[in-house]
Amino acid sequence: MKKKTLSVILWAAAGLILAAATIGTAIYGTCSTPSIRMDQSVVLDATEQVMTCARSGDYAALSGMLYGNPDLGQGIEKEDEAKSMIWYAYLDSIQWTLAEACTPTDTGVTLEVTVQCMDISAVTTALQTIAPERMNQLAKEKTKEEEIYDKDNNYLPEFVAEVLRSATQEALAQPPQMLERTMTLELTRAAGSWQVVPTEELMHFLSGFVAE
């Protein structure tokens, strides 16, 4: 069997970190200064709902809960099994703690949220070691080259997908490395309710804290 480079597998594995979720650019403005007198429990509840929706992965619903209804993209396609496995493992890992009180600002309030979650970059780094090993193992299990290569002697997409699926399962079976980040969320009054502003900091969280 002709010896093949591992670069296609390594690039595919490394590329997972860039595909955590495609977040559209959020454009938001300001609104008039709200009254300082407010029920902070309402602010905490609005933030809790946003965090819960974010963890569910339903970004279409989440968009409607954010100020300006930003386009949050389509997220990870479920058909891309390896990416989907990593993304939903990340979502399942998310936990958070809200600060007890918010801080008034000219346009609303801010509230600190401490997030603990799986480190996606640690998983994709592990894949760069695991994937070549799984490729060699799976290649040895095949009885025909046609199960690995196409007519142009390139890896078959289904073989690459099988390698990444198996490698991802192995990577996710390991005890996860966790991140802890504290975000300062901004909330403003709109349409009679408190809404979280889609700041860059929030977008970073919604994309899995990748590329830090």
Predicted regions and their residues:
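A short, structured loop/turn motif at beta-sheet edges
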Residues: 100-110, 187-193
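Gram-positive cell-envelope targeting signals
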Residues: 1-65, 109-113
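Short Pro/Gly-enriched beta-strand edge/turn motifs at strand-loop
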Residues: 80-84, 162-170
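A mature extracytoplasmic/lumenal domain signature
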Residues: 66-68, 100-102, 113-119, 198-202
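Short beta-strand edge/turn micro-motifs at domain boundaries
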Residues: 132-158, 171-212
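Core segments of small alpha/beta cavity-forming domains
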Residues: 32-103, 122
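Primarily extracytoplasmic ectodomains and periplasmic/lumenal surface modules that are beta-strand-rich
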Residues: 57-61, 118-120, 193-195, 203
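Short, cysteine-centered beta-strand-loop-beta hairpins and adjacent loop/turn segments enriched
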Residues: 116-134
